Amino acid sequence: MKHIQIRNSDMAWHIAANIQFPPNFDESKQYPAIISVHPFGSCKEQTSGNIYGKALAEKGYLVLAYDASFQGESGGEPRWIEDPTQRVEDISRVIDYAVTLPYVDAERIGVLGVCGGGGYAINAALTEKRIKAVVSITGVNIGRLFLEGFSNYDPIGVLNAMASQRTKEARGGELQINELLPASLDAAKAHGLTERDVYEATDYYKTPRGQQPGGATKMLFSHAQKTLAWDAFAFTEVLLTQPVMVVVGEKVGAFGAYRDGLEVYGRAMVSQDRQLVSLPDFSHYELYDKPEAVQEALEKVIPFFNTHLG
């Protein structure tokens, strides 16, 4: 694995990434590449890199797992911004870098995203036609999630609060950084936060199971307005022409990945090859790293990429 900083000539800050190489890597050859996109609140050292990225590299792909702008080891100020348009642009920036590498076949580039990263991967493929195949692992439409649960079903109230907070910050006030999860499983239980997705997210992000320094699960509240008006799947019926695989778990939770997966699969009517992989025994967060869940997903994902990028 090689750690890099991507900063193309038209970028104001760098994107931190890890390149994972296939076995017996030979710089004189060309390889298909996968851009691996992390979830909302995550980082490249978690599921996008150390689970799916690692597995795909072992199967012959060159994988670039990276930190989103404003997050992890990537640049951008202020920190902890979740900006969907920037998240999608980050994918193109990483592709810009990948196509300069002599050992990457620019005609065989795919994207895989997990959770919010799955929604971003699909959205990027709508207009970024250098992407030849896209896989969403328990993908979430982050705009829909913010509009509903993350705003407590009061989006106008939250937007007004964001407006007030941003004005305070513009006048020199302290930034409001929201923690998105309970501090521990005990804290989740103490506050009655035992809904499947919330509790399993806490188990992943707040325990040694998945915890990493870059996976902050934080958000700058005042800069999240655009997220509430963003739709990962807009124009899918017209623009998503590339092969797409949507992997979902049928153990449903409040974050809505199962619902979003069925929606985008149904709307991907012009895709050259749309596939839905619905796994009955697994939940959203089990698909992050649980060996049985990941194995079942990869049994479909790897042949899919082999078909379209091989």
Residue ranges and their predicted role:
Residues A55-G75:
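Conserved alpha/beta-hydrolase
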Residues I122-Y204:
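Alpha/beta-hydrolase-fold enzymes
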Residues I81-P102:
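Alpha/beta-hydrolase active-site loop
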Residues G41-K54, A68:
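The serine-hydrolase catalytic nucleophile loop
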Residues L239, V246-V248:
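Short beta-strand/loop motif that positions the catalytic acidic residue
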Residues G253-G261:
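Conserved alpha/beta-hydrolase "acid-adjacent" motif
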Residues F282-V294:
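Catalytic histidine-centered segment of alpha/beta-hydrolase-like enzymes
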Residues M1-K29:
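N-terminal cap/lid segment of alpha/beta-hydrolase-fold proteins
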